[in-house]
Design a protein with these regions (language model features):
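Cytosolic-side transmembrane-helix boundaries in multi-pass membrane proteins
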Residues: 1-25, 38, 240, 247, ...
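Cytoplasmic juxtamembrane regions at transmembrane-helix boundaries
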Residues: 83-104, 226, 231-234, 329-334, ...
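Membrane-helix/interface signature in polytopic inner-membrane proteins
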Residues: 221-259
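Transmembrane helix-bundle core of multi-pass membrane transporters
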Residues: 153-226
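Transmembrane alpha-helical segments in multi-pass inner-membrane proteins
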Residues: 266-268, 273-343
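Transmembrane alpha-helices
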Residues: 214-218, 248-274
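Membrane-interfacial amphipathic/re-entrant helices at transmembrane-helix boundaries
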Residues: 2-76
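Single transmembrane alpha-helix segments in multi-pass membrane proteins
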Residues: 36-37, 55-111, 124-143, 244, ...
């Protein structure tokens, strides 16, 4: 198959993936509207569905800034899950890696008062280490990464809570607010906050920084690594067929560990973007639930079909309807309606292979037949003149 046919096939795959995702979103929104009708038909349209569709634009520019602030870590946790998916692994441990990344970023900011980019590096490093451990067990003991990742989610949560809280005497802990110290309220931490370059004034919020642009840049970088480098080829080869990769001389064990380490690093980086933008402070007393950003990353990756560039748009969409749900009037609807719609969309994404097959059949059926029935080009033959 020549390069032209490969490019054509890749374009068809991209088109069908995008259309399948849009179909999932459309069906999810329709089902969500029907739920709103069932709960309170009188306000289902204006006070319900329209507010969800408007998202942050319902209270612009503040709401839009809130969307961007929440989307940045979603892009990163989505990349974390998608990167592992591409290499044949299921990184359900993004929540734990995100937790360790949050601790690394906040420790460097509060205790060491380091610049924001150093704090981000610390978050990335700790997340990567936490991700590499399940990768090690998978590579050398063939222990399912899903099981070890889930266990390390909870280990990471309780470890970080104890390191921060320390029976209420931890130096990072604010007893009055029962959270870590607020970075924006202490000038000593100013250098640890990600710069906003005027975005805070534009969106009238103190948590909108360049984090979303950093996340988008990382997504593009991951796409390049996976599709344009030998390292990315080796990772995907191990994911597609370990035996064939081993036969080709690729170090299977090394690539499994590196894949999970990089997935963890991406999740940790996302936590750094979130907490160093001062969107929230860590609450060590919340010991019963893991950070939702880690699990929402699974939703982002599924909606994007594990495409690194697609995670940017799917994260923005998930953030959009989540913020829209927060603007619902609690007199008529619970704010969890947006989570319900997200859940329906993600559930439908599980059937995306079926949707892609149907869409491909409808759009490219005739084109495929033309390619199959086309006669191959005649081979060039050289004739030798016989000398007398």
């Amino acid at each position: 198959m020549d390069k032209k046919k490969l490019s054509h096939s890749s374009l068809q795959s991209s088109v069908t993936s995008v259309l399948a995702a849009l179909l999932c979103i459309l069906i999810g929104l329709i089902v969500g509207f029907l739920v709103l009708l069932a709960i309170n038909p009188a306000h289902a349209w204006g006070d319900g569905f329209v507010r969800i569709l408007k998202g942050g634009f319902h209270d612009a520019p503040y709401g839009v800034g809130k969307e961007l602030a929440n989307a940045a870590p979603l892009v990163m946790t989505g990349l974390s899950v998608a990167f592992a998916f591409k290499t044949g692994l299921f990184n359900i441990g993004a929540a734990g890696q995100y937790t360790l990344g949050a601790y690394g970023a906040l420790y460097c900011a509060i205790m060491l008062k380091m610049p924001w980019f150093v704090c981000l590096l610390a978050a990335t490093l700790l997340g990567g280490i936490w991700g590499a451990i399940p990768g090690f067990f998978k590579a050398y003991f063939n222990i399912n990464e899903v099981i070890t990742s889930i266990m390390f989610n909870w280990i990471g949560l309780y470890l970080v809570n104890e390191l921060v809280y320390q029976n209420g005497t931890g130096p990072m802990y604010d007893v009055r607010n029962t959270r870590t110290l607020n970075l924006s309220k202490n000038p000593a931490f100013a250098q640890s906050i990600i710069p906003d370059f005027g975005l805070n004034k534009m969106f009238q919020t103190n948590s909108t920084t360049i984090a979303i642009f950093l996340a988008a840049a990382v997504a593009i970088l991951i796409w390049v690594v996976l599709n344009k480098t030998t390292f990315g080829y080796e990772l995907k080869a191990v994911g597609l067929n370990k035996s064939a990769a081993r036969y080709a001389g690729i170090n299977e064990k090394k690539n499994i560990i590196l894949s999970m380490a990089r997935a963890g690093a991406l999740a940790g980086f996302g936590a750094g973007l979130y907490y160093l933008s001062n969107v929230a402070q860590w609450n060590p007393l919340n010991s019963t639930s893991l950070p939702t950003m880690g699990f929402n990353g699974i939703s982002v990756a599924l909606l994007a079909s594990s495409n690194p560039i697609g995670t940017i748009f799917s994260a923005l969409f998930i953030s959009h309807i989540s913020v829209g749900g927060s603007f619902l009037s609690t007199k008529y609807y619970p704010t969890e309606i947006s989570d319900l719609i997200s859940g329906i969309i993600i559930y439908l994404c599980a059937f995306s292979m079926l949707f892609r097959g149907k869409i491909h059949g409808l759009l490219f059926k005739n084109a495929d037949k033309t390619n199959v029935n086309a006669e191959p080009a005649p081979a060039k033959t050289e004739t030798k003149k016989e000398g007398k």
